[in-house]
Amino acid sequence: MAEDSESAASQQSLELDDQDTCGIDGDNEEETEHAKGSPGGYLGAKKKKKKQKRKKEKPNSGGTKSDSASDSQEIKIQQPSKNPSVPMQKLQDIQRAMELLSACQGPARNIDEAAKHRYQFWDTQPVPKLDEVITSHGAIEPDKDNVRQEPYSLPQGFMWDTLDLSDAEVLKELYTLLNENYVEDDDNMFRFDYSPEFLLWALRPPGWLLQWHCGVRVSSNKKLVGFISAIPANIRIYDSVKKMVEINFLCVHKKLRSKRVAPVLIREITRRVNLEGIFQAVYTAGVVLPKPIATCRYWHRSLNPRKLVEVKFSHLSRNMTLQRTMKLYRLPDVTKTSGLRPMEPKDIKSVRELINTYLKQFHLAPVMDEEEVAHWFLPREHIIDTFVVESPNGKLTDFLSFYTLPSTVMHHPAHKSLKAAYSFYNIHTETPLLDLMSDALILAKSKGFDVFNALDLMENKTFLEKLKFGIGDGNLQYYLYNWRCPGTDSEKVGLVLQ
């Protein structure tokens, strides 16, 4: 992915204008980017303004101080003094600080905002420009014969560490980093809470490599402060099937967002992936970067309306009482699809045939082997639920699946967690999709979920409104790294990333 030689252009992306993030971005610092879409659902439209401070510089220093683990390099803005005796150098320093502050743009949430945005990091990468009209298909850069062997340089005071997630203490460290610093909604009310068991499922599919679990630690005390991951996947893009990686879990500790660590993390995981002969990647982000292949929207279906209102995940509609809202979202106690049962190991071959055949109709979709199907779909408590539909003659005709991803509820006296089910892959050949997804809601409700989330990809638009989903307030963009192809509509996306 990122260039394996540090050119002047790529080095520029580590200067003051580049900003670190939590989520795939590389050009934004103080905002927590929504790599998954906001866990706040209906919330998250507002941006938080954050105060910035700046360390004092020596006059005529000619540049910034070097990075260190203890130097926050925050920007402090002072009002210009009305005293005419204030030294000219002081006024110039103030003016420069104000210019730097104005240059620190917030993340672009839509194409209009993105058109005005500067992407100093992504402009150095093999991705299409936002205004580029694309009609061709293929790699932007050819595969490289000589890949950089040495890791990229981190700011002073930090060190690389490959995380061995089979070590319970290391896994706990990663869980803590993500739990305290990963994606949250703009109002700081909800934050994704990936369990250690979920992380093992998401980060260790068939073909996973230890070196693709890339961490950053403070050199002095070995505290884990940054992470990025890659997992292998065969992805079909229109008519081409490519071995690539899915990039996920880019996270930088909140106190180190001014260190420009995110661009280095992206470059380093790129180098490590390139060393294995892979030169394409797919990733998602809640912000607009150069250049989305597709834009999807999250929808939310209330399963526990009382709790969702109490934690302010959702709000009562005008002229609606809580009792009427609870009645509106009430579900049957039992499913109605005949032959619906949990997936078992004996179903792996049939499920693989169902999913690979069904996904051929989409422009962006995985191609799975039996080992991958077993990993991603065999039920695991509190991680993944898959139910198949078996006909009277023993043939599997359909299946539904959803994964578990709770969010921590911040600042609430009673509720500490919001249990969310996320629609995964739902394949139908005989059962109407509307009936299949109605049963998915009933099953999720019976398992204690508070909300059921789904993107408007694949055929999901056919059931979202009918099953009383409400539209979310944020988009999820899909991106390809080092691959150029025309964009597509959300209903032609057949890929779901955790």
From Swiss-Prot:
This is Glycylpeptide N-tetradecanoyltransferase 2. It comes from Homo sapiens. Its EC number is 2.3.1.97, 2.3.1.-. Tetradecanoyl-CoA binds at residues 117, 122, 250, 252, 258, 260-262. It is a peripheral membrane protein. The lineage of its organism: Eukaryota, Metazoa, Chordata, Craniata, Vertebrata. It is found in: Cytoplasm; Membrane. The gene is NMT2. Belongs to the NMT family. Residues 45-57 have a biased composition (Basic residues). GO terms for cellular component: cytoplasm; cytosol; Golgi apparatus; host cell; plasma membrane.
